[in-house]
UniProtKB/Swiss-Prot annotation:
GO terms for molecular function: structural constituent of ribosome. Induction: More highly expressed in the fermentable carbon source glucose compared to the non-fermentable carbon sources galactose or glycerol. Its main location: mitochondrion. This is Small ribosomal subunit protein bS1m. GO terms for cellular component: mitochondrial small ribosomal subunit; mitochondrion. The keyword Repeat does not apply.
Amino acid sequence: MSFAQILRGSRAMASPKCLPESNYSTSHLRFPRLQSITSKKNSRARGDWGLKRTLPKIKTRYICVRQQDSLYKQADFQSSAKFVRLVRNWFDAGFVRDPSEVALLQELLKETGLKDTRDINKVFSPSKQSDENDNFRRYGVSGGIQYSNVPLINSRVTPNCESNCSNIRRRLTAHIISSDASTAYYGLGGLILRLPRTVVFNRNRSSPLFSQEQRISYTVYKNGRLRLVPFSGPELETHLAYPSEDSEVESFFNRDIQLVAKRDSSLDAPVSYQRGIMKFFMAPSQTSNNEANSSEKDNLSNS
């Protein structure tokens, strides 16, 4: 009997717990907060990771276990190699970074065996460093990965963007959080994006198709606003994107979507999508002033 089989049959075996929270806010911002499990090549080919249950066969030798197995719910896992690919994609998109983050990416590339054909040092230079939007660092915009703030949106205005036009327009992937009969919720950098389900008609029956990933095209304006549209289909002018509160940023993607559903039901009237984004990326004082100005305009128009 192998050591992995002994561990799997033992009641004392448990998945590694999450790393303890630190008293310093910047002590672990650039490093994963979840422990990883590694396995030999011949073991992982069989899906044998030394846990109580056999996991699906995957090529990478890094997985992250988010919580312990219980009688009612088994621990979900994901590949740590996703983090490396996500960082590379966001670097290609032209996001702000510093030398320590570039060094972190190089170490991850060595560990995972991925080859980087580009010179990462050419991407970052102090002379070309653009101003960062404090709200992006504050809310941890990380493309759906909550344990790192490596990707930061570059809000620099280029000479070609003189008016309120976009200076960044890229495509990215938002991962599913929850869904119901008619709506799908995706997590994207501390935001919850609500999209309607798509229905595809075939010869036999019409069934709603729901994908675990959604291709999103986003546009960053020079005033700091962020606009999200589907890769194909109508623009999201009538759909809301809800930001996470300060206390929910760390565990936002591990929480139930019902918290956001309650917040949605508490709204008295539908709010436009752009207004929700403005309230997220603007300071609270500016938001209150804008709401006061809008209410004054409404009163004048009614009078």
